[in-house]
Amino acid sequence: MEKYLSVTTLTKYLKMKFDKDPYLERVYLTGQVSNFRKRPTHQYFSLKDDHAVIQATIWSGIYQKLGFDLEEGMKINVIGRVQVYEPSGNYSIIIEKAEPDGVGALAIQFEQLKKKLTEEGLFQERFKQALPQFSKRIGVVTSRSGAVIRDIITTVSRRFPGVDILLYPTKVQGEGAAEEIARNIARANQRDDLDLLIIGRGGGSIEDLWAFNEEIVVRAIFESRLPVISSVGHETDVTLADFVADRRAATPTAAAELATPVTKLDVLAHLQNQEKRMVTAVRNVLSKKQEALKKCSQSVIFRQPERLYDGYLQRLDQLQLRLKQSLRTRISDNKQLVQARTHQLVQLSPVTKIQRYQDRLGQLDKLLGSQMALVYDAKVAEAKRLSEALLMLDTSRIVARGYAIVKKEESVVDSVESLKKKDQVTLLMRDGQVELEVKDVKTKEI
């Protein structure tokens, strides 16, 4: 009887065969990218031809080192190993290396980055800076030992002696070159005494020049405050640095010429031309002044110089007359002012003030005497009237006239309403007093 295998057993067997097959451990495969959608980490897609499809995987670390981005429909050559994925039973190729078929990976990467940066606008003319006419100090980012720096120094010294060249020794190819180029561009921009920056290197293969195609270098040039001249490779070599730089030069010598657009000979010629123009201008002015002097020497004033100051003599007489009149007026005004001030001083003199106060005091003394007499007479009359009123109120005088005063408990009784039957009262009379008891109280009818 036949023994039936489980799916798992069969899949494990197939996986074991795949893993141990020496032909599947390293497979060279060509195909067209299909079902590709770029992911942030690992990449999963298909490779196909006209008759078959195989699943493909590139781990993130491998993909980052490819140097180009996969695109849908791109034909690529890959090296990898074939494996079986047990849970699904599918087999796939794990890619360890890949490159575009027919076109180099660097060319693909160049076009992809160029497209990206073009869409961002980094290569637009509106961002290009004008190169200075006269540079005092030029920075150069290149190798210390290459011919580039020698050609630049020679050309600049010949065209305009006195311009300083500041070299930033830089690795221009190989691992880490792009980062160093970008770093030195940033360093140069930190200085305030640089007017211009030249970056470049000599010729070489696309791999040798690749550092100048790296995105970090392109962005460093774009962000440069200083105008940048790119001189990378030969005239036929084109890099992304050339697109973003403010100017491109085919050779280091051409870069130095762009950096010094005005030469020493140009300046000397300009100065000589200016000198000629100044000499001509001075001669013209001198000629005009001589002609004017000649005309002046023939004028009436020069023939009869005394007429030159006739008008001034007349003016002097007028001023003298006005001065005398002004002095007389000033003296008169001052006399009147002195008289007024003298009168004021007299009025303000202590003797005058004392006399006025004495006169006023005499007047007040007389007025006070008369007022005091009037007050005295009024007070005497008032005292007499009050005395008579007091006498009228004296009880002894009242009882002497035959009247009697009734008192109850030391209080004078002035109304029957203050009394009631059996009240004890005292009757004060002229020659004594009588103690009485009230028998009855009768109110006077009105």
From Swiss-Prot:
Its EC number is 3.1.11.6. One of its GO terms (molecular function) is exodeoxyribonuclease VII activity. InterPro entries: Exonuc_VII_L, Exonuc_VII_lsu_C, OB-fold_nuc-bd_dom. Keywords: Cytoplasm, Exonuclease, Hydrolase, Nuclease. The keyword Cell cycle does not apply. The keyword Hydrolase applies. It catalyses: Exonucleolytic cleavage in either 5'- to 3'- or 3'- to 5'-direction to yield nucleoside 5'-phosphates. It is found in: Cytoplasm. Its main location: cytoplasm. Belongs to the XseA family. This is Exodeoxyribonuclease 7 large subunit. The gene is xseA.
